[in-house]
Structures are given as structure tokens and as C-alpha cells.
């Protein structure tokens, strides 16, 4: 396996296409530029990738277990099936990212920008989304059991009565929405057993009794 060096996008993608294997685990990749890279299936376990730019990258089935992703840019990245178990992604940019079926168990997404991110069928059990910005995010059929969304902001930013956040068919058992702004959110057919909505703004929300 090759250890990551300063390969250009073209060099890396050519090597990957030829079948070369890379090893990103435990590497120091602070503020590295991975824009547009095909990193599908790669292993970043326990790597330090704080502040790295993955915007537009293909991260399908990529492993980030134990990695440091604080302040990284994952906007427009495809993270379908990626594994992020028990790591911190605080203050990370995840705008328009795709997390379909991803494993984000116990991940810290506090203060992250999740605008229009797609978490459909993702596992967010025990995840921390404290003060995260979730307008337009899709959590359909996701598992947010005991997730903490305290002070999460799903406001529709002046877009009228459009749905701000989608929680359709998701499992929200025991989730904490204290002080969250969920105006116009859609909770249709979601499981909300033992959810905490103390002082949450649920104006015009659907599916909440």
C-alpha cells in the first residue's frame, strides 16, 4: 500500500484507476486539499484531517473511524455508506453532502453546517448536533435514537412556508430538541417516543401532536 504524499488530483485518480492501494490511516493530513478526489472505500481511520477540504469528493464507503475531522469541508461530497463512528466533526461544513446509509453513531456534529445535507437512512444514534444548522436537511428514515439536537437551527431563512427539515419515517426515540428551531419541520410518521421538545419552536411543523 502507498502512504499518502502530495499527489495531484490527476496523479491520484490515475493511480487509483490502475488499482494502486493507498493507506491514509493514522496519517497527518491537516488542511490537505482533497477536492474532487475519488476516495471511495479508502481508510482514514485515526487520521488527523483537521481543516482538510473534501468538497466534491467521492467518499462512498470511506472509513473515518477515530479520525479528527474538526473544521473540515465536506460540502457536496458523496459519503454514502461512510463510517464515522465515535468521532468529532465539530464546526464542519457539510452543505449539500450525501450521507445516505452512513454510520454516524455517537458522532459530534455540534455547530456543523448541514444545509440541505442528505442523511436518509443514516444511523445517527447518540449523535450530538448541538447548535447545528440543519435547514433543508433530509433525515427521512434515519435513526436518531437519543440524538442531541439542542439549539439546532432549522429555520427556513425567509423561504416562506417551505419545509425546513425532513424527519419523515425517522426514529427519534429519546432525541433531545430543547430550544431547537424547527419551524415548518416535517415529522410525518416519525417515531417520537420520549422525545424532548422543551422550549422548541415547532410552529407550523407537521406530524407533531
Report each predicted region and the residues it spans.
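Tandem repeat scaffolds
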Residues: 2-209
Amino acid at each position: 500500500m502507498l502512504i499518502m504524499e502530495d499527489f495531484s488530483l490527476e496523479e491520484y485518480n490515475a493511480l487509483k484507476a490502475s488499482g494502486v492501494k493507498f493507506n491514509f490511516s493514522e496519517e497527518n493530513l491537516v488542511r490537505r486539499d482533497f477536492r474532487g478526489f475519488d476516495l471511495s472505500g479508502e481508510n482514514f481511520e485515526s487520521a488527523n484531517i483537521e481543516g482538510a477540504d473534501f468538497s466534491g469528493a467521492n467518499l462512498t464507503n470511506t472509513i473515518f473511524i477515530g479520525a479528527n475531522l474538526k473544521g473540515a469541508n465536506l460540502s457536496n461530497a458523496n459519503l454514502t455508506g461512510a463510517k464515522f463512528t465515535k468521532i468529532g466533526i465539530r464546526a464542519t461544513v457539510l452543505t449539500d453532502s450525501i450521507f445516505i446509509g452512513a454510520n454516524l453513531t455517537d458522532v459530534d456534529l455540534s455547530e456543523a453546517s448541514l444545509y440541505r445535507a442528505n442523511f436518509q437512512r443514516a444511523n445517527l444514534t447518540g449523535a450530538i448536533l448541538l447548535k447545528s444548522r440543519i435547514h433543508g436537511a433530509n433525515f427521512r428514515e434515519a435513526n436518531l435514537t437519543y440524538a442531541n439536537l439542542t439549539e439546532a437551527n432549522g429555520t427556513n431563512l425567509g423561504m416562506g412556508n417551505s419545509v425546513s427539515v425532513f424527519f419523515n419515517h425517522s426514529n427519534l426515540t429519546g432525541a433531545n430538541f430543547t430550544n431547537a428551531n424547527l419551524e415548518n419541520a416535517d415529522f410525518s410518521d416519525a417515531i417520537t417516543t420520549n422525545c424532548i421538545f422543551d422550549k422548541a419552536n415547532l410552529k407550523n411543523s407537521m406530524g407533531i401532536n
